[in-house]
Amino acid sequence: MNLYDVIKKPVITEKSMYALEEGKYTFEVDTRAHKLLIKQAVEAAFDGVKVASVNTVNVKPKAKRVGRYTGFTSKTKKAIITLTADSKAIELFAVEAE
């Protein structure tokens, strides 16, 4: 698996925005990716970023209905990335001051 295929998109929720204050960044990642691969992908994708730890969460599929048909959403995996103290911030999550 290519390192640039591991990270799918950032997770922008109220909970993940509060975690930014603690230096924790949340991404949706490939379901086959393991913690070491996620760490290597983040450090390769963002310059000057050093990862201290990676926590992962497997998100179960949810039942959805469209009319009389029922189905399920796809399962996903979230990774919560904690950066070291001497690491640069990830600019993707930068909040502009007004």
UniProtKB/Swiss-Prot annotation:
Task: Work out whether the entry's keyword set contains rRNA-binding.
Answer: yes
One GO molecular function term of this record is: structural constituent of ribosome
UniProt keyword RNA-binding, yes or no? yes
Top-rank taxon = Bacteria
What is any one of the record's Gene Ontology cellular component terms? Answer: ribonucleoprotein complex
* Keywords attached to this entry: Ribonucleoprotein, Ribosomal protein, RNA-binding, rRNA-binding
State a single Pfam family of this protein.
Ribosomal_L23
Q: Which GO terms describe its biological process?
A: translation
Q: What does this protein do?
A: One of the early assembly proteins it binds 23S rRNA. One of the proteins that surrounds the polypeptide exit tunnel on the outside of the ribosome. Forms the main docking site for trigger factor binding to the ribosome.
Quaternary state and interactors: Part of the 50S ribosomal subunit. Contacts protein L29, and trigger factor when it is bound to the ribosome.
Give the family per the record.
Belongs to the universal ribosomal protein uL23 family.
Give the protein's recorded name.
Answer: Large ribosomal subunit protein uL23
